[in-house]
Each structure stands twice: as structure tokens, then as C-alpha cells.
Amino acid sequence: MSQGLAERQTGWRGPESFRRQLGGGPSAAGRARRELTALEADLEGPVLDSVRLLVTELVTNAVRHAGAPAVELAVVVGSRRVHVEVANAGGAFAARPREDGDSGWGLVLIDRLSDDWGVADEPGHQRVWFEIERV
């Protein structure tokens, strides 16, 4: 991983399982879920289910709130943790969990279901990451 957020924020240094450019638009979340099928042999069902849900939320946020014309998904499957990053080429959005209203629950789910997560606003894009224990 080239000086990615994982390395800077969490000390994670491991081989990427994959990195994909998903494009933007309403179908980006579906494309992300299809890409995650590549992990079915490597991840336990409940972990993969959580990763799939949280990736869907992050990709949807990137498209809906940041107006991202393109979204990048990167996943590292380690022996103890799964590290996921979603980067958007749009503007930054307020990445704070909100529990009010009918929408805005994506980051609440990230906060509750992941073991760690964070955000980096970088020139030209925003990167949101999370980690889930495999145990």
C-alpha cells in the first residue's frame, strides 16, 4: 500500500487483498458488493457480512454526500483483522455519526460494527477506513 491511510493512521503494513476503481453513480455500492465476493474463501460469514454492509454504507456516502465521480475500494485481509478503505474523488463530507432522522445512519453502523475507523481528508479526495477483528 503506497503510504495509504492505513499505514499512517493505524500502523497497518500488509499486502492488499485487492484495490478496485468502482466509478461513481447509484450503482457503485452494488459494484463494491460484487467485488467483495472475491473474499468469500478468505473470510468467515459474519465478518464478510459486516464488511459488505459497511462497504455499502461508505460507498453510498461517498457518492451521495461527496458527489464522488469515482470511488476506490481497497481491502487487506490479515490474519487477525480486515482493513478496508473507501476513497472518493469528490469533495469531503462531514464524516460524523448521526443518530437523528431517517438517514445518516451509515457512520453510526461503522462506529458500532467496526473495531476501529477513521477519516483522512487529503488533497482532492477523502478516505474513510475501518477495521474488523476476524476472531
Predicted regions: what is each one?
Residues 30-56:
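Conserved short strand/loop->alpha-helix "switch" segment adjacent to the catalytic nucleotide/phosphoryl-transfer site
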Residues 1-19, 62-135:
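Conserved beta-strand-loop-beta-strand hairpin that lines the nucleotide-binding pocket
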Residues 25-28, 47, 102:
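Generic hydrophobic secondary-structure packing signal
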Residues 24, 33-36, 41, 87-92, ...:
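Mobile, glycine- and charge-enriched loop segments
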Residues 57, 61:
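Conserved phosphoacceptor histidine of two-component systems
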Residues 19-31:
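STAS-typified acidic loop motif
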Residues 5, 26, 51:
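Solvent-exposed, flexible loop/coil residues
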